[in-house]
Amino acid sequence: MAIEFGDHSSGFHHTEVIRFINNEVLKNGGSSEFYTTFRSRSWNEIEDQLRTILVDPKVPRSLKRACTWSALALSVRVAARQRQQQARRVWRLQDQVGEHESASWTLVSELQRLREERDQAAAQLLCTQIILQEAMDEREILRGRLLQAKRSALPVVPERGMEYGKTSLLSFEEKELGDLEFIGSQNMSHLEAQIPILSCLPGLSSPWVQAMDPFLQMTMAHPVPLKAKFSLEFSFSTPVPCPALMDSEATATAMITGLPQIAPSGIQPSSLCVTLESQETIASALDQICPRQKECSEILQDVSHLADSISCCEGEGPEKPQGTSLHGDSSNNSHKDNQAIPQIMAATEKKNLMMHQGTAAVEVNSNHSIKEEPVMPKGISSQGNKTSSTKKKRPKISRRVVGLIESISHNTQCVSVTPQETHTQVNKTTSTLKTYPGNLLRKPDQGKILSCNQKEDSKTLQRLTDLGEGTRNCQKEDTFQQTTCLNAGVSPNEKKMPQGTGKNQSQRQKEEPNSFQANHPRKCKSYLMNKYPKIQLATKQRVKQPEGIKSLESKQPQETKSSESKQQEKPLSHRTSANCICPSSKTVNRSWYKGCYKCAKTSA
């Protein structure tokens, strides 16, 4: 039989179908060989074998029918087998789907966990950013507090320049005090009423140099009468002394009564002596100082360059007589242009070594000026009248001169010159006068011509009267040793001066108004010798004086008296509401004096 009953893999479930198929195979002469041979093969192979049998003509028809029924039963079997295979495949696929689903669920849970972690990380990051911002803000606050604490804890450190200035000032104070003690013993015999005003303040409480308030420039009368003999009168502002440095409380009280008010923070500046120059020289000095202030940003550098230029003038000798006046006027006008002159003069006094060379050059220039225009206090009086006439022609320059002298009067300095320097100056002056005697014939009748100008303009003479008071104050502060020596050196040659060229000189004054440019050599010399005597005094303090100098000092008072007596032959008398001039002694007396205190004292 071809198909077995109960074979589930055959694909047939009913036995009637299986019996019918078996009977048909058997009736046609077939057997179960074809079914059994192709039972495990695929349908394609079964179909190919059936085609071969059906095409073969040698196979009987009944056999072909039996093979066809066996192939039909095999097709059902193949279908059943495929169904089973597909069922298993489906089961397998289902298993895979389940597995995939379980994997997806696992991934979903993992994804959810990662999302939660991400959210937590984002929240933590946000919190961290907030905390960081708060920390940065707190750091800035603490940093500001720390900087504020450091600023409050830092000490006030002065600048290097100020520290050097303080050290130099202290060392200069010690030298100056020693010099003043040494000179005071020599000059006390020549001073009847000396006002002690030092050029600097010792013991500054602060290293910082305080700026001095500008002075109130005004014409005031000095409360103490002075003994110096001057025919000219200058308007001035009384210099301010330091009460702590006065020799006595009485002198300090007398000085303070006539002083202008000064701010308490001001520092007494280094002083200058008044030097009266011709108006042309002062105008040229003003022109000289203006471009210098434009070129240099600090006036201290101007003073340094000025010291270098004076050092260079030492080798040129008397060929440049106008350098001294320009130098003095440049320094004086610096105070007018800039109220910071105390710091400048303090720095100038620090450079005394360089200024010593400049002083030597100034001595030579002053001697050359004496060679051309040798005049005594009478000549100074005539020069004052010449200044009055010049003020009429050039009122602007006159006002500049008055303002200049008023500014200079705040800077007067009480200094001295050693006998060695005086002896050197006398020798130079005497030799120069002998070498050029022809130039001494210029000034005999100058007083007459210029006294007429005083009568023409009483207002100008009153201004000169006030100006003379300033000169008397300034030269009273200077030691009389220098003035005595200079006058003694010039007077022997002035005795030999002929008197026949006065008219020629008056004509020359009309033609050449600039001829009086070097008219005050003694004032130029005394100004610069008073300005820079420190190094000379320090170097010559311990040197013994030669015998010739001592003998010269003994002769100086007599020669001074003789020269002054000759100069007083033509007195200049004038009286104003503020003061009066004695005709005999040419002494300026205050309005409250009934007579001349000098004549009364001399007669007594």
Swiss-Prot record:
Compositionally biased tracts (Basic and acidic residues): 544-572
UniProt keyword Transcription regulation, yes or no: yes
Region (Disordered): 314-337, 374-397, 485-523, 538-580
Composition-biased stretches (Polar residues): 322-333
UniProt keyword Transcription regulation, yes or no: yes
UniProtKB keywords: RNA-binding, Transcription, Transcription regulation
Function: Plays a role in transcriptional repression.
Stated family: Belongs to the TEX13 family.
Protein name: Testis-expressed protein 13C-1
Originating organism: Mus musculus
